[in-house]
UniProtKB/Swiss-Prot annotation:
It comes from the Eukaryota. Belongs to the universal ribosomal protein uL15 family. This is Large ribosomal subunit protein uL15m. It comes from Bos taurus (Bovine). The keyword Cell division does not apply. Residues 27-68 are annotated as: Disordered.
Amino acid sequence: MAGPVRGAAGPWALDLLRALPRVSLANLRPNPGSRKPERRRRGQRRGRKCGRGHKGERQRGTRPRLGFEGGQTPFYLRIPKYGFNEGHSFRRQYQPLSLNRLQYLIDLGRVDPTQPIDLTQLVNGRGVTIQPSKRDYGVQLVEEGADTFKAKVNIEVQLASELAIAAIEKNGGVVTTAFYDPRSLEILCKPIPFFLRGQPIPKRMLPPEALVPYYTDARNRGYLADPARFPEARLELAKKYGYILPDITKDELFKMLSSRKDPRQIFFGLAPGWVVNMADKKILKPTDEKLLEYYSS
């Protein structure tokens, strides 16, 4: 029993406690105005069988593996294999170089059209990015911008489309397609680090057997083709696309336009076996007969 309650509300409070029922689970109610979402009963959607159906392996969780078709030969074994991506990591890649991009580099002065153009000029002019470690084997000259190309150039690329060759020869230029092995390609793209090592310039390797027909064909302007067949191939292409073939022998830049590399040569003006001394700015040439025979073979 509680002690005496002080104040006027004392007797009234005691009477109220005596009259009110005791607090229990039977008389608990939520506060007036409060809301609580009603719990969904099991029988509304997934009750009884819990969505697993009536007996069987599907209800008991012993389903077969993915792709099993009840014992018959599955689909992934009925269809034969085909090597769509076979040898994809060994395929040669060529970065595209459009005529529009080449004209843009010439207009900005990043590529000099009065000098023979090869990968060294294109890489130094930030026209293309070549990564021999990622199976890059050079550039492919494509015909985008053939209608607006106006420069007269002597360019060496690895692949070239027929229309791109026609667009350059229409302006009096010369195109040569040449192969570079990965080591020669890396030296050609980054000559300064190679010269600083003080090593002799190696010989350029010949193309693999699969590429020999391409580089020995005068229609592709291959560097291994017979030079006597080039005039006929140039005239045939001019007739096909309907333009007058300029006579480059009367051009003031004929010496530049007619310059070509030897099949074993990497740089213009530098023969295999030579050593470029960057410190003294000199070129060292071999004099031993065996070395001369090796690098000239």
